[in-house]
Amino acid sequence: MAASRSTRVTRSTVGLNGLDESFCGRTLRNRSIAHPEEISSNSQVRSRSPKKRPEPVPIQKGNNNGRTTDLKQQSTRESWVSPRKRGLSSSEKDNIERQAIENCERRQTEPVSPVLKRIKRCLRSEAPNSSEEDSPIKSDKESVEQRSTVVDNDADFQGTKRACRCLILDDCEKREIKKVNVSEEGPLNSAVVEEITGYLAVNGVDDSDSAVINCDDCQPDGNTKQNSIGSYVLQEKSVAENGDTDTQTSMFLDSRKEDSYIDHKVPCTDSQVQVKLEDHKIVTACLPVEHVNQLTTEPATGPFSETQSSLRDSEEEVDVVGDSSASKEQCKENTNNELDTSLESMPASGEPEPSPVLDCVSAQMMSLSEPQEHRYTLRTSPRRAAPTRGSPTKNSSPYRENGQFEENNLSPNETNATVSDNVSQSPTNPGEISQNEKGICCDSQNNGSEGVSKPPSEARLNIGHLPSAKESASQHITEEEDDDPDVYYFESDHVALKHNKDYQRLLQTIAVLEAQRSQAVQDLESLGRHQREALKNPIGFVEKLQKKADIGLPYPQRVVQLPEIVWDQYTHSLGNFEREFKNRKRHTRRVKLVFDKVGLPARPKSPLDPKKDGESLSYSMLPLSDGPEGSSSRPQMIRGRLCDDTKPETFNQLWTVEEQKKLEQLLIKYPPEEVESRRWQKIADELGNRTAKQVASRVQKYFIKLTKAGIPVPGRTPNLYIYSKKSSTSRRQHPLNKHLFKPSTFMTSHEPPVYMDEDDDRSCFHSHMNTAVEDASDDESIPIMYRNLPEYKELLQFKKLKKQKLQQMQAESGFVQHVGFKCDNCGIEPIQGVRWHCQDCPPEMSLDFCDSCSDCLHETDIHKEDHQLEPIYRSETFLDRDYCVSQGTSYNYLDPNYFPANR
């Protein structure tokens, strides 16, 4: 037992053995450092950790009467934390070994089943190269080894062994790699649970902390160093002293259920939980696939001493000196071979296989080797390894769904190296990891490095993409920028046009229409090309049509509809802002409040704007002519007025000629009544599409028109005095505006008489002259058949020119005097001969010139030199308008037929 063995150097032991990181990266995969066999175990330990100060802590073999001494021992060990590794003396190790052997001999009298013996022989045959097989072992220790290798199982269970490799962290940053050979299934005694509970109690973990421990297969905690040979009596003492006797096995079996209720996305700053999390990461990363998922499904029953001795007997690769006894030297070399065999036997699909419950116990035992006050410095290792693909220990980066770790395809040594890389990437700030974030890593590590123990589909469900706050803020800003509407205007446009919504929408529509026109031209060219190809091969073209193949024909476009613009706000004499205060009481207080509320309008507000106050305007929403959303996207406008659901279908719509004729017939059919509203209701019911209010308004306007035209009114004659006051700025007064309006439908059945224009006597004169010219040209001596010849037209031109010459000669002779007209340039009065009258000046301020001053450049404030002058050859007679009988249709008090409606 005192013989040495070869020790495998792993990534977890590099810093402890004095090796640098570069050596770890180059040679650590498949390299082993063998120590001389003649060196004793004590010297081997001291040579591997020469800086450790030996501080012997005697561990007494306790019984039920020595609880106080052991607890003092535990408290003393908690009060001091060594930043360096230390070694144990040989006396300590002898005492520990002796105590372990005595504990194992107590249960030596129990019979050993033949199945266990056969398993033991198989284990020995698997490791023929072991350096310790040649040394004889006493018969009593052989029985102890047989009992300590396996858990007490029934003979019916299959005996295939699974190797579980656990990485242990103690209070001095020590790392141990244990090898536990157990059967597939095995019951565990409740004494084991009591022992683990006792360790938890000694370390200050009571029932309230049981919810924090979320992993069955790895319960990270501890400050005691008796992780492999602690006595059962000591555990009873610990349980009794800390009041944890009520802790049952269900705390561990139900911890998987507790872990399912933990939010894996919320961080916290519990340093204690952080260290537990890191220990759990390291342990579970070292587990093979088939050992991870079965830990919560096995019953926990079995003899305690066998479990403890199996932990002691199957240790492998002890890297640091702790409270481990001399049983470290009893570790077999075949455990290395079994580790490789178990890793190679991992299923390629990553599906979980049953694993013994003893893994949970070993993880519990090894997690109790770390003091609480040392947890803040435990994760500050200076070693950094390159992050592996899908590393679950890197908490600073968000999890990604596509990060499945391909551990199944790696060799055993590569797997171990990868796990060591993951171990070295622990966060240095203990406040970065929350209790709920511990649940993330616990759950993900239970899955065995992202999907080792669970199927990949289940493992992916626990890992989601969590964007950082900056990413979410940038995404939100980008969405807000995308919501901003596109503004269409030219830099050279006027400021009023740049901020005008109708102008911007119009430019946007023009831009879209131009693009659609370009696309239409390209589509026409494509259609012509396809037509020529189809004419070359018509049969193939028809076959493609029958097969419904994609020929590449262009798709039809949805032509953008022209925007509806309310022109009243631009053509009316008053703007929106002035119209708002027209015909209202102009109180200063009210005007000030309105200004404070709405402010000065930066641009004219269109009634077409469907947005409310405070909402952003959208200029990019263009209605499509053939789309159903074109008309329903905003409120309907009918001749400049908003139409809502409360308005009738014919709201603000012009009356058609048919409706007007039917109205005239109904006015005769329904005579006037005392209550006119009844009459209007009857007519509205007869029409069917108009309301009584619309009929009353129409009839009122119709009666006024009839009265002004002098036509008998089929009802009460309205008082025209109320309606005779017209605005001088009416748009209908301008003669050019008569083409902008549709003819009235009021007088559809009445043909008004034709009157001569009384305001212009010259039109009568010119019309008479034109008639005379036409009479003169119609010479009956010339046959009708010759009147279409060009010679006849030339003859008419000569006759017209002759008449003009005669008029000019008469004017130059001085016989014509324009009485009442004075030349505005030379001042001669009356003007003789031809009088030149300005046509561009207003009639009240028009200028007249004589024939000699017609070529002068006379200008005034009103008259300019570019004005057009009209020659007048004949003098006009004076006509006093005050003595003329009015030919209008308005009332006249001199008219004997004057009979007003209201007397």
Swiss-Prot record:
Enumerate the residues binding Zn(2+) 2: C838, C841, H863, H867
- Top-rank taxon, per record: Eukaryota
Indicate which residues the UniProt annotation says bind Zn(2+) 1. Answer: C823, C826, C850, C853
Pfam families in UniProt: Myb_DNA-binding, ZZ
Q: Which gene encodes it?
A: ZZZ3
Q: What is the lineage of its organism?
A: Eukaryota, Metazoa, Chordata, Craniata, Vertebrata
Species, as recorded: Homo sapiens (Human)
> What residue intervals correspond to the zinc fingers (ZZ-type)?
818-877
Protein name as it appears in the record? ZZ-type zinc finger-containing protein 3
**Location(s), subcellular:** Nucleus
